[in-house]
UniProtKB/Swiss-Prot annotation:
Function comment: Involved in the biosynthesis of the enzyme cofactor mycofactocin (MFT). Catalyzes the oxidative deamination of AHDP (3-amino-5-[(4-hydroxyphenyl)methyl]-4,4-dimethyl-2-pyrrolidin-2-one), forming an alpha-keto amide moiety on the resulting molecule, which is called pre-mycofactocin (PMFT). This reaction occurs via a 5-[(4-hydroxyphenyl)methyl]-3-imino-4,4-dimethylpyrrolidin-2-one intermediate, which converts to PMFT. The alpha-keto amide moiety is the redox-active center for the redox activity of mycofactocin.
Alphabetical list of Pfam families matching this protein: FMN_dh (PF01070)
Source organism phylogeny: Bacteria, Bacillati, Actinomycetota, Actinomycetes, Mycobacteriales
Reaction it catalyzes: 3-amino-5-[(4-hydroxyphenyl)methyl]-4,4-dimethyl-2-pyrrolidin-2-one + O2 + H2O = pre-mycofactocin + H2O2 + NH4(+)
Protein name as it appears in the record: Pre-mycofactocin synthase
GO biological process: mycofactocin biosynthetic process
Encoding gene (name): mftD
Signal sequence segment: none
PROSITE patterns in the record: FMN_HYDROXY_ACID_DH_2
Length: 390
């Protein structure tokens, strides 16, 4: 329907806020502690300007690239996010949207849909895991991903279980039983469209994480898996090297902000790193990802693929990141708002917005390809870049 279309990611967010129960929407905007980092992720892009060319724009712009061996139509991938139960089709709808727009998807190990179902919707799936449960349990999940056909592995390490969110932590129930439904009903009843979408399926939102269990099993409840994760000692660099060797294929380390950590990741044999602060959901006060990107890209960009996630809201943000050294970006909240606003079509809408913005920025800069972008296309304030580590 025409009135389902939205022009910007900001409008998608507004619609998500209107259509989701309050506690569900809060899970899409939550960030750690004061929210300094999540705010800086977005604001930092506004500090960067462009140095446009007025003559010489090509008739068509090439946005295609590759990430970990996968051809994608533009330098934008779907970032792994947990429990996408804001829509009945969840990760399957997102996978279909990514496939329709020619890009790859990171699938969270805390997803609400099985890896087998998601890969059936889009073969370009990078399976994401946390260091959870020790080597034997992790090896089982890696083998399941391999058997399902995942084309790469993403390991997320930047998590400190921050507490004390100033606006309150998301209220995710342990299970969706009658008691929970009754407790949430005052919120849900004033969001009839959201309620109707799930009502048609005769299934409440799924709060289990099937990819944490064996294939064919329902998997643990979200909070059971979360509790096990909190109780698992964090990995060492030897663990990362072991996991990379166990997988034996394209391997991304997500959550790198420091130059010295980037160098250690290269030594561990990774294929790619993502400069990321977990969308501001990690250690509050960490700089925006885009501030850390130039130093990391300069240090290791000729040895591994460097990506970025955090704060991407428009295509011009993507262009700024690529010009400063990113091969591509991963988006998270932006597509979740699209999913909440209009399901698969809403995610496609978000990807179209980003693609249109990339094309417009390339045209204004006088470039025919994203591969022509350089740092001198960007106006960078003197105190913008943060070099963390050596």
């Amino acid at each position: 329907m025409a009135d389902e279309w939205f022009e910007t990611v900001a409008i998608a967010q507004q619609r998500a806020k209107r259509r989701l129960p309050k506690s569900v929407y809060s899970s899409l905007i939550s960030a750690s502690e004061k929210g300094i980092t999540v705010a800086d992720n977005v604001a930092a892009f506004s500090e960067l300007g462009f140095a446009p060319h007025v003559i010489g724009a090509a008739e068509k712009r090439d946005m295609s690239t590759t990430v970990m061996g996968q051809d994608i139509s533009m330098p934008v991938l779907i970032s792994p996010t947990g429990v996408q139960a804001v829509h009945p089709d969840g990760e399957v709808a997102v996978a279909r949207a990514a496939a329709a727009r020619g890009t790859a998807m990171g699938l969270s190990s805390f997803a609400s849909k099985t890896i087998e179902d998601v890969i059936a919707a889009n073969p370009k799936i990078f399976f994401q895991i946390y260091w959870l449960g020790g080597r034997d349990a992790i090896a089982e999940r890696v083998e399941r991903a391999r058997q399902a056909g995942a084309v790469g592995l993403i390991v997320t390490t930047d998590w400190t279980f921050s507490h004390g969110r100033d606006w309150g932590s998301p209220k995710i129930p342990e299970q969706m039983n009658l008691r929970t439904i009754l407790r949430l009903s005052p919120e849900a009843i004033v969001r009839p469209r959201w309620l109707w979408k799930f009502g048609k399926t005769l299934r409440p939102p799924d709060l289990r994480v099937p990819n944490q269990g064996r294939r064919g099993e329902p998997g643990p409840a979200f909070f059971a898996a979360y509790g096990e994760w909190m109780g698992t000692p964090p990995p060492t660099w030897d663990d990362i090297a072991w996991l990379r060797e166990l997988w034996g294929g394209p391997f991304m380390l997500k959550g790198v902000m420091r130059v010295d950590d980037a160098k250690r990741a290269v030594d561990a044999g990774v294929s790619a790193i993502s400069v990321s602060n977990h969308g501001g959901n990690n250690l509050d006060g960490t700089p925006a990802s885009i501030r850390a990107l130039p130093a990391v890209a300069a240090a290791v960009g000729d040895q591994v693929e460097v990506l970025l996630d955090g704060g991407i809201r428009r295509g011009s943000d993507v262009v700024k990141a690529v010009a400063l050294g990113a091969r591509a970006v991963l988006v998270g909240r932006a597509y979740l708002w699209g999913l909440a606003a209009n399901g698969q079509a809403g995610v496609e809408n978000v990807l179209d917005i980003l693609r249109g913005g990339i094309d417009s920025a390339l045209m204004g800069l006088g470039h025919s390809s994203i591969h022509d972008l350089r740092s001198d296309d960007i106006l960078i304030p003197a105190d913008f870049v943060r070099r963390l580590g050596r």
